[in-house]
UniProtKB/Swiss-Prot annotation:
Residue ranges of coiled coil: none
Biological process, per Gene Ontology: L-histidine biosynthetic process; L-tryptophan biosynthetic process
Annotated EC: 5.3.1.16
Catalytic activity of the protein: 1-(5-phospho-beta-D-ribosyl)-5-[(5-phospho-beta-D-ribosylamino)methylideneamino]imidazole-4-carboxamide = 5-[(5-phospho-1-deoxy-D-ribulos-1-ylimino)methylamino]-1-(5-phospho-beta-D-ribosyl)imidazole-4-carboxamide
Entry annotation: catalytic residues: D8, D129
SUPFAM superfamilies noted in UniProt: Ribulose-phoshate binding barrel
Protein name: 1-(5-phosphoribosyl)-5-[(5-phosphoribosylamino)methylideneamino] imidazole-4-carboxamide isomerase
Pathway participation: Amino-acid biosynthesis; L-histidine biosynthesis; L-histidine from 5-phospho-alpha-D-ribose 1-diphosphate: step 4/9
Compartment annotation: Cytoplasm
């Protein structure tokens, strides 16, 4: 199971939101590139970048920072936030991002997802962000009329091979991940599942590994020191 540090960017800084609320933001560093270097130096196998301003505006905003990270770290990068067109996905991949993550488009434009999967295959991942088990869109500011489980099934039917599942109510809270829903999403022959939201202890990571997820994205717990990356990596070897 991969342990993937999250780097959420807002206004050029590295931040964390509480339950996806843009009004409840904590700034952890003014230099996301330096943060990326720190996590990779500590052994991160991959980085999870989120362009929060992009998620709200509908188009990537932190392009220069993303490019600087991709060009200067020796680890693959996945990127989400504001990627809602073929052109936006192509631009992200041209930056050197290995994997792009689409969320809003998965709900509102499944035909786009089908085309992207046909064209880019494993480079496409879907963010299934859920509030009260219903999918959220537009930077988590809107709730759609489809459940997380149904959305994953819909994406699987389109050929999607990887889903990042986040329980918004737990994100940034240091509480615990939603093990029950995560378990329901992990199915033989289904998309690989990467878990996110509320992961803050070694026990959480071990429970997720038992469920069978491909990876776990850790954010606030790494920044507060509640969880050390080296301990997390060692726990799932």
């Amino acid at each position: 199971m991969e342990i993937i540090p999250a780097i959420d960017m807002q206004g050029g800084r590295c931040v964390r939101l509480y339950q996806g609320d843009f009004q409840r933001v904590t700034v952890y560093d003014d230099d996301p590139v330096a943060v990326a270097h720190r996590w990779v130096a500590q052994g991160a196998p991959r980085l999870h970048l989120v362009d929060l301003d992009g998620a709200r505006s509908g188009h990537p905003v932190h392009t220069d920072i993303i490019r600087a990270i991709v060009q200067s770290v020796d680890a693959p990068v996945q990127l989400g936030g504001g990627l809602r067109s073929i052109a936006a996905v192509e631009r992200a991949l041209e930056l050197g991002v290995q994997r792009v993550i689409l969320g809003t488009a998965a709900v509102h434009d499944p035909e786009l997802i089908r085309q992207l999967v046909q064209q880019f295959g494993d480079a496409i991942a879907i963010a299934v962000d859920a509030r009260n088990d219903m999918a959220a869109t537009a930077g988590w500011t809107e709730t759609a009329a489809i459940s997380a489980i149904d959305l994953v099934e819909r994406m699987a039917a389109l050929g999607v091979r990887r889903v990042i599942y986040t329980d918004i109510a737990r994100d940034g809270t240091l509480s615990e991940p939603n093990i029950a829903t995560t378990r329901a999403l992990v199915r033989p022959g289904g998309p690989a599942i990467i878990a996110s939201g509320g992961i803050s202890t070694i026990d959480h990571l071990r429970r997720l590994a038992e469920v069978g997820v491909e990876g776990a994205i850790v954010g606030r717990a790494l920044y507060t020191g509640d969880l050390s990356l080296s301990d997390a990596l060692a726990a799932v070897q």
